[in-house]
Swiss-Prot record:
Originating species: Mustela putorius furo (European domestic ferret)
GO CC annotations on file: blood microparticle; haptoglobin-hemoglobin complex; hemoglobin complex
UniProt xrefs under CDD domains: Hb-alpha-like
Name the record gives this protein: Hemoglobin subunit alpha-1/2
Similarity comment: family membership: Belongs to the globin family.
């Protein structure tokens, strides 16, 4: 459960990311594919090479979904219901992949914003990404 302090940390960090969210989403997705090659199996139709326009575009979709989740942090199930359906019923993404991408998002954000990435912010973002992952996998049960 996200505390009020966690929500503040997540919102303020996301505000600082600003217009870079799509860029960071693409970078985190590319990092996920490089670090965890099994995640590539869901994208056989993508050019997965470094700097791929398809990876960047999908990373932007991920970032846009997270931006929506930040804006609706008090109702993540409502905000992410359609994405949960998509990933559970149509794409059938293995739930572990959300944890892997979350880790790579944390690494990417820490690389770009080291001064702001305090232990408290790290913990809050980790809890937020975990909450998002939980919602996205809730329809699997």
């Amino acid at each position: 459960v996200l505390s009020p302090a966690d929500k503040t940390n997540v919102k303020s960090t996301w505000d600082k990311i600003g217009g870079h969210a799509g860029e960071y989403g693409g970078e985190a997705l590319e990092r996920t594919f490089a670090s965890f090659p099994t995640t590539k199996t869901y994208f056989p139709h993508f050019d997965l090479s470094h700097g791929s326009a398809q990876v960047k575009a999908h990373g932007k979709k991920v970032a846009d979904a997270l931006t929506n989740a930040v804006a609706h942090v008090d109702d993540l199930p409502g905000a992410l219901s359609a994405l949960s359906d998509l990933h559970a019923y149509k794409l059938r993404v293995d739930p572990v992949n959300f944890k892997l991408l979350s880790h790579c998002l944390l690494v990417t954000l820490a690389c770009h914003h080291p001064a702001e990435f305090t232990p408290a912010v790290h913990a809050s973002l980790d809890k937020f990404f975990s909450a998002v992952s939980t919602v996205l996998t809730s329809k699997y049960r």
